[in-house]
A protein has these predicted regions:
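Structured, amphipathic secondary-structure segments that form assembly/contact surfaces
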Residues: 1-7, 14-29, 33-54, 72-191
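Solvent-exposed, amphipathic alpha-helical segments
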Residues: 59-70
């Protein structure tokens, strides 16, 4: 009789442990109209749902715009650069290349360039070349500080990414890169 009671107690304990490891929250996306009625609802979301192609493409577009834009407002330029580095890990080649680009040649340094000119970036296409590599094309319009068009150029980049599971992110990491999409490497050229 005691062995039966012990067996029942063990099964109950294992059942409790099993239930405690299961997620209690199941995320859903629900759209409501102006009156608060449900207009559309999706099924349960998977953990990887947010890392779809559109989120990756938006991250890549942000990366190019933040890296290539030159604005005379120092505060905005600083924010662009901080957001740019949120998409790279220090150990990746992309960080070293970006450091060289921003700090190497004074003519490429956005703070120095902003003394004479401004650069606006317009993304024209983002195409997946593989699961982790994307080709991005964009137009850059360079203007003088008075606003007259100085030059216009078409650019192309190949960017390699990787995705980190954001479930283990700290609060700061979630604020800076919520999707966990990181730029591993990049190369760009004027065409």
């Amino acid at each position: 009789m005691t062995s039966l009671s012990l067996l029942i107690a063990l099964v109950a304990v294992f059942g409790c442990v099993y239930n405690s490891t299961k997620s209690k929250y199941i995320p859903y996306v629900i759209e409501v109209d102006k009156l608060g009625h449900v207009a559309a609802a999706s099924g349960p979301l998977e953990i990887s749902t947010f890392s779809n192609q559109r989120v990756i493409q938006a991250t890549l577009a942000d990366f190019i715009e933040q890296a290539r834009t030159v604005t005379p407002d120092v505060s905005i330029q600083r924010k662009l650069i901080f957001k740019l580095y949120d998409k790279m890990n220090q150990s990746d080649p992309a960080t070293l290349k970006m450091n060289e680009f921003l700090n190497g040649d004074p003519e490429k340094n956005p703070y120095k360039r902003a003394e004479k000119e401004m650069v606006n970036v317009e993304i024209t296409s983002i195409l997946a070349q593989s699961d982790t590599t994307y080709q991005i094309e964009w137009d850059e319009s360079t203007r003088t500080r008075t606003g007259s068009l100085k030059s216009k150029a078409h650019w192309k980049a190949l960017i390699t990414i990787y995705i980190v599971d954001s479930r283990d992110f700290t609060e700061e990491m979630i604020r800076s890169n919520p999707a966990g999409i990181y730029i591993e490497n990049f190369s760009w050229t004027k065409i």
